[in-house]
A protein has these predicted regions:
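Conserved "right-hand" nucleotidyltransferase catalytic core of DNA-directed polymerases
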Residues: 1-145, 159-161, 168-171
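Conserved catalytic alpha/beta cores of large enzymes that bind or transform nucleotide phosphates
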Residues: 151-175, 185-197
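Cytochrome P450 catalytic domain signature, combining two hallmark sequence patches
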Residues: 56-60, 179-190
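Second-shell residues forming the walls of enzyme active-site clefts
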Residues: 148
Length: 197
C-alpha cells in the first residue's frame, strides 16, 4: 500500500488506444449485422436486436421479464455458431479491459510517487484471503493475450524484477496440513486438482 507498484503510463496509453480501435472495429461488425446502431451496453436494446430483429434464438427472458443477454446465454448462442453474440462477448471483454484496467490504472497513478497504491482489506473475505481495492490489483486478467498485455504494464525499478505468485487452492492446502488429512496431502503432492476427485 505504501510503496505502491510502478506502472508504465505510456504503455497503458498505447493499450487504451489499441483497445479503442478494437472496440470500434467490433462495433462496426455488430452494427453491420444488426443493420442499425444501438447501445451495445444496454441489455434491453441488445435483447431487442437479438430476439426481435435478428431472431437469433427463441425468446429467452430472465425471471424479471427482461431479455436474457448474460454472458452464459451469449456463450451458448456463440457456441451454436452465431457470429453476433460472439462479437458482443468480444466487445464486452475488450471494453472491460479498457475501462477497468488500461484507463483506470492511469487514473490511479499517484502524481507524487508515480505509482499505483492499492488498499489491502484484511477482513473482507470469509475465507481469510486478502482483498484489494482502489484499484483491485488481485484480479488483473491473464487468460487472453489482451489481458496479458495489461500485466505487462507493471514494471520494476531499474535493477529489480517483478515476480508473480499464486497460492493455488491455498485454503484446502492449509486444511490438509492442519487437519493432517493424508489423502488430501498426497493429492496436492501429486499435483491433482482436488475439486475433480
Amino acid at each position: 500500500e505504501i510503496q505502491g507498484v510502478k506502472v508504465d503510463n505510456k504503455f497503458l496509453s498505447i493499450l487504451s488506444k489499441k483497445f479503442e480501435k478494437k472496440i470500434s472495429l467490433i462495433e462496426d461488425k455488430i452494427y453491420k449485422i444488426s443493420k442499425k446502431k444501438f447501445n451495445i451496453a444496454s441489455t434491453k436494446q441488445l435483447g431487442e436486436i437479438m430476439y426481435e430483429d435478428l431472431k437469433i434464438a427463441s425468446l429467452k427472458k430472465t425471471k424479471k421479464g427482461s431479455f436474457a443477454t448474460s454472458a452464459s446465454v451469449l456463450e451458448d448462442l456463440a457456441f451454436k455458431g452465431n457470429q453476433f453474440p460472439k462479437l458482443v462477448l468480444e466487445w464486452r471483454q475488450i471494453s472491460k479491459l479498457k475501462n477497468t484496467y488500461s484507463d483506470s490504472l492511469q487514473e490511479h497513478i499517484n502524481p507524487k510517487t508515480k505509482r499505483v497504491h492499492t488498499s489491502f482489506l484484511l477482513a473482507a473475505t470469509t475465507t481469510g484471503r486478502l482483498a484489494s481495492s482502489d484499484p483491485n490489483l488481485q484480479n488483473i486478467p491473464i487468460k487472453t493475450e489482451d489481458g496479458k498485455d495489461i500485466r505487462k504494464s507493471f514494471v520494476s525499478e531499474k535493477g529489480n524484477i517483478l515476480i508473480s505468485a499464486d497460492y493455488n487452492q491455498i485454503e484446502m492446502r492449509i486444511l490438509a496440513d492442519l487437519a493432517d488429512v493424508k489423502e488430501l496431502k498426497k493429492a496436492f503432492n501429486d499435483q491433482q486438482d482436488i475439486h475433480s476427485l
